[in-house]
Design a protein with these regions (language model features):
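ABC ATPase NBD coupling module
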Residues: 22-39, 177-181
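Catalytic Walker B motif of ABC-type/P-loop ATPase nucleotide-binding domains
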Residues: 111-114
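Conserved ABC ATPase signature
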Residues: 32, 86-96
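Conserved ABC transporter NBD signature motif
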Residues: 13-21
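Conserved catalytic motifs of ABC-family nucleotide-binding domains
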Residues: 107
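Short coil-to-helix segment of the ABC ATPase nucleotide-binding domain corresponding to the Q-loop/switch region
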Residues: 51-58
């Protein structure tokens, strides 16, 4: 996860995204790359407690020259009616939706999701996975998701399994299912 954002360095090999080798970039170029091309969704929502839903999402918009329309995104996220609520007035699933909104509002090429359902119950997890699927279809972002939930791999186009930091399996999923049809 941290390699794609070039937050951590690899022991060997390199990462090439859109023809750019990340390890050859200066710190300034890496910062620009992260701002323009990457959106992050974490297991812990990391929302700003004294900002409402809309303001938390706007924080991500300031990083982009090509930000999405916030009101349209709030509708997509199912949060428009909650846009003036503070994070402590939201459920865990709603907070994760805000986190996804903050990541996607800047219209990144790649959305990095680190255990986005890890702290959620089954039903809320399915809702979040459906939302990620919808965001992918609507905005065309590449989604890279890290998860320990084996069932989630079934909704992916491409599945890479790691063990101790090394790639163990690298497969194309030819039997992709929708988030709605996932079971665990």
């Amino acid at each position: 996860f941290f390699f794609f954002g070039w937050i951590d360095n690899a022991d060997s090999g390199y990462i090439n995204i859109n023809g750019d080798k990340l390890e050859d970039m200066s710190e300034k170029k890496l910062t620009q790359y992260r701002r323009k091309h990457l959106g992050y969704v974490f297991q812990m929502y990391n929302l700003i407690g004294n900002l409402n839903v809309k303001e938390n999402i706007e924080v991500g918009a300031y990083l982009s020259d090509n930000a999405l329309d916030i009101d349209d995104l709030l509708h997509t996220l199912g949060l428009y009616e909650h846009r003036y609520k503070l994070p402590n007035q939201l459920s865990g699933g709603q907070q994760q939706r805000v986190s996804i909104g903050r990541a996607i509002v800047k219209n990144p090429d790649i959305l990095l999701c680190d255990e986005p359902t890890g702290a959620l119950d089954y039903n809320t997890s399915k809702e979040i996975l459906k939302l990620i699927e919808e965001v992918n279809k609507k905005y065309g972002n590449t989604i890279i998701m890290v998860t320990h939930n084996e069932a989630i791999k079934n909704m992916a186009d491409h599945v890479i399994k790691l063990r101790d930091g090394a790639v163990r399996h690298n497969d194309i999923n030819t039997n992709k299912v929708s988030a709605e049809d996932l079971e665990w």
